[in-house]
Amino acid sequence: MLRDFKKEKEMPTEIIEKYKGQVPDEIIEIWENYGLGSFLNGYLRVINPDDYKELVEETYFRGKESIPLFVTAFADVITWQENRYIGIIFYKEEDFDIMASGMDFFFSDIYTEESFRKEFFDLKLYGKAVKRYGELEYNQSFCFVPLLGLGGKKSIDNLDKGDTLTHIYLITELVGKVGIDD
């Protein structure tokens, strides 16, 4: 199912049990067979939902109906929403989108559909960033400095590595939450 998976560690058994029936069987299978780690050349990371759940609930208008599943190399969080949709939260741009209805074609689209990858992932910039700055650690993302919402440019020259959770909290504190007016 996941090509080029680089395992970081096992998904805790209690997390697998906690989310059975709440996430698609394909996700449970990934957690059981692959664990936590990265794929798509390190662009996507399988995460422990509990590590991101509070963040998503506090910073995204659909947060209470969302279960975080993956995070991208640019700190975008991919979620399972309303037991039906795969959503993506683009914190860096204060935006969100629905990637798919159900899991049926999600993984095949990631690997085989160029239009899908172009719409939701910035693999071209990621490739340049890895060449210039090196590969990311499991808990890191490429961060725009200054933040895009504060006038930063979406450019290879404006990237730095940082802790993913810290960076998302920083974005939401300085720029704003996604779909929530404070």
Residue ranges and their predicted role:
Residues 6, 111, 120, 127-129, ...:
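Generic low-complexity, intrinsically disordered sequence content enriched
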Residues 73-75, 100, 129:
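A sequence-composition feature that detects small, non-aromatic residues
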